């Protein structure tokens, strides 16, 4: 690995020198990769349990058995100081030749380097500057590192290297570990919220015979035994709604979706969604539910506060959140003429002002949505529900009883990006079949993201699905908001990258 401050040649030289030490240890009868060492306490707990108020005599009676990776190392001949790091934090150790034994000190301890993993036993004391330290009485090398870590004061800063070699990033950048602890906490809190409200967590297929549930290009694979193509799922929606047909009234799933699309600060081909469906509710009740869910998660990870600092701005999650139609949002944020917002010619002029050339295949709904996406979406910083989408761009959503051209649908936007998408579900099998057919026609006309016709799903609807509300929430984007991450790859442990070389 080439770091910011170390050339490939320098790194190769260090690797060679470390391998020489590794062989010297083996020749001395030392196993550089043993097993069996069991720490009895983590490093942060040592510090918490032994505060500044403890007198030196009492402190010296405290014995600990700890392990960690060496992050700092200072040799002073017969005395060595090192800083160990484990998942919980850091702690200094001190090894003296006269205490651990001259032979062990010279043949083993002096061959230990930054990056090595060490287990030690000893008692506690404080240095002259007051730093809590373990006086090493016994030690064991647990893992010899043959690659050097990035230099102490420069760290690992190159983003490509950080994402590609996340294991190094996690070692040297403690704030990165905190991001993924927060991510885990967010998912755990969502799961608790759903379970406490009677939702059943389920698992649906990751490989689909027919891609569906969203408009996106799928990844294609092949099942050799069945000699058939399968598709990595772009959404679990149609399977989850089959469960509603089957009698489960509240279901949710937290899992991966896959979409064969481009990479961007907001998009990764593999991403995590929480999708849920509830019988006997609609999209308006889901807005209240979503507001409560997100607020609960924000307070849990933000020390009870509903204000979050994100990329230099303060996001206020306290309610009630704004609710606007796409047309109302265009009027508000683009200063468009409300009296003309339904005119085709006026919409085309708005699109042209944004550099958008309307395609002849676009109906007014698609044109309106494109104007919203290009001209408004990035301006929606405070949590905002965009509601009542055109039915033509919502092929799985129920029509409004008041206006058949409108879908009972909303999307939640925060910090200029979509966080959730929800609707009152379409449960009329004939209407759904008609919309599937229009999607097939769009696909035949060249729209690679249009949906396929799923005859089995139509068959399921023909058995009767109760009135249902459903929603998908982007976990990755929600975590971005709560960790002040500008790029989705910051919140994915192993984001998709171009192949090296």
Swiss-Prot record:
Family the UniProt entry places it in: Belongs to the class-II aminoacyl-tRNA synthetase family.
Cell membrane in keyword set: no
SUPFAM superfamilies: Class II aaRS and biotin synthetases, Nucleic acid-binding proteins
Coiled-coil features, chain-numbered ranges: none
Localization annotation: Cytoplasm
Gene: lysS
Name the UniProt record assigns to this protein: Lysine--tRNA ligase
Annotated organism of origin: Magnetococcus marinus (strain ATCC BAA-1437 / JCM 17883 / MC-1)
Record keyword Nucleus present: no
Chemical reaction(s) catalysed: tRNA(Lys) + L-lysine + ATP = L-lysyl-tRNA(Lys) + AMP + diphosphate
């Amino acid at each position: 690995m080439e770091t910011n401050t170390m050339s490939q040649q320098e790194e190769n030289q260090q690797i060679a020198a470390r391998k020489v030490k590794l062989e010297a240890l083996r020749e001395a009868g030392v196993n550089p990769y043993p097993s069996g060492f069991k720490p009895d306490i983590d490093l942060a707990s040592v510090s918490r349990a032994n505060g500044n108020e403890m007198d030196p005599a009492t402190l010296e009676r405290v014995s600990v058995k700890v392990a960690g990776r060496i992050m700092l190392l200072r040799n002073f001949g017969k005395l060595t100081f090192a800083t160990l790091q484990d998942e919980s934090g850091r702690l200094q150790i001190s090894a003296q030749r006269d205490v651990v034994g001259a032979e062990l000190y010279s043949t083993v301890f002096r061959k230990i380097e930054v990056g090595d993993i060490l287990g030690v036993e000893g008692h506690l004391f404080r240095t002259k500057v007051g730093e809590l330290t373990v006086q090493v009485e016994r030690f064991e090398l647990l893992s010899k590192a043959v690659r050097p870590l990035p230099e102490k004061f420069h760290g690992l800063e190159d983003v490509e290297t950080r994402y590609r070699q996340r294991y190094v990033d996690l070692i040297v950048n403690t704030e990165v570990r905190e991001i993924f602890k927060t991510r885990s906490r967010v998912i755990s809190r969502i799961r608790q919220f759903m379970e406490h409200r009677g939702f059943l967590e389920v698992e649906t297929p990751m490989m689909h015979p027919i891609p569906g549930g969203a408009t996106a290009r799928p990844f294609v694979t092949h099942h050799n035994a069945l000699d058939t193509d399968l598709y990595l799922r772009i959404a679990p929606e149609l399977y989850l709604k089959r469960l509603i047909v089957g009698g489960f009234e509240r279901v949710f799933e937290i899992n991966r979706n896959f979409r064969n699309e481009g990479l961007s600060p907001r998009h990764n081909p593999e991403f995590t969604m929480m999708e849920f469906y509830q019988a006997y509710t609609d999209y308006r009740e889901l807005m209240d539910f979503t507001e409560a869910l997100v607020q609960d998660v924000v307070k849990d990870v933000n020390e009870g506060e509903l204000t979050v600092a994100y990329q230099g701005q303060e996001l206020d999650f306290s309610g009630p959140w704004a609710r606007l139609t796409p047309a109302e949002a265009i009027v508000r944020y683009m200063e468009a003429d409300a009296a003309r917002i339904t005119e085709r010619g006026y919409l085309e002029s708005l699109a042209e002002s944004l550099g958008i050339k309307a395609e002849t295949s676009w109906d007014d709904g698609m044109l309106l949505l494109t104007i919203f996406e290009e001209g408004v979406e990035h301006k929606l910083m405070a949590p905002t529900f965009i509601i009542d989408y055109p039915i033509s761009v919502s092929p799985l959503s129920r029509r409004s009883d008041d206006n058949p051209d409108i879908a009972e649908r909303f999307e939640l936007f925060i910090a200029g990006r979509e966080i959730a998408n929800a609707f009152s579900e379409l449960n009329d099998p004939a209407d759904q079949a008609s919309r599937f057919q229009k999607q097939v026609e769009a696909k035949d006309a060249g729209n690679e993201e249009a949906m396929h016709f799923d005859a089995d799903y139509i068959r399921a609807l023909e058995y009767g699905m109760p009135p249902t509300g459903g929603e998908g929430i982007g976990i990755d984007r929600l975590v971005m908001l709560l960790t002040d991450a500008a790029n989705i790859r910051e919140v994915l442990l192993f984001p998709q990258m171009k192949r090296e070389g």
